């Protein structure tokens, strides 16, 4: 009788935990949606032409990342990829590793605007990995300065990075990976 009691208790705990898990999932999705709206507004304010690019694109992705570096660095974050025609969001994660002459900590927003539906679909279905880009940037409180305009061209996509409250200085080789968030989709 004791194993049956233990099994019943485990089943009851599992059933009670499921609604909380669904509520947590919905809460996290809502937080990502809010962060995405805030980030887009900041990109639009910084460079108004981006709004037209986003509206004309077959898809885009927006991420908020947090990182720390001193010679070796890393950052990670989450966000979403949006298909505006299907009105569908796919929740995604991002991780970045770097090595080189660098020091800093901060929060950044990353916007990827896809030039083709195929590039967007490939990003969502297979993720993305790329690396080898040098970076030199400095920014405080949402302002970017340094090596370039904060815009970078990748095959069939344009990316924009907005430094929110951090300072990154150096020439670092970075590898970045994007993938679907299996818990939020």
Summary of predicted features, one role per range:
Residues 1-10:
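Bacterial N-terminal signal peptides that target proteins for export
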Residues 23-185:
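Small-residue-enriched, tightly packed secondary-structure blocks
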Residues 10-16:
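Hydrophobic core
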Residues 16-23:
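Sec/Tat signal peptide C-region and signal peptidase I cleavage site
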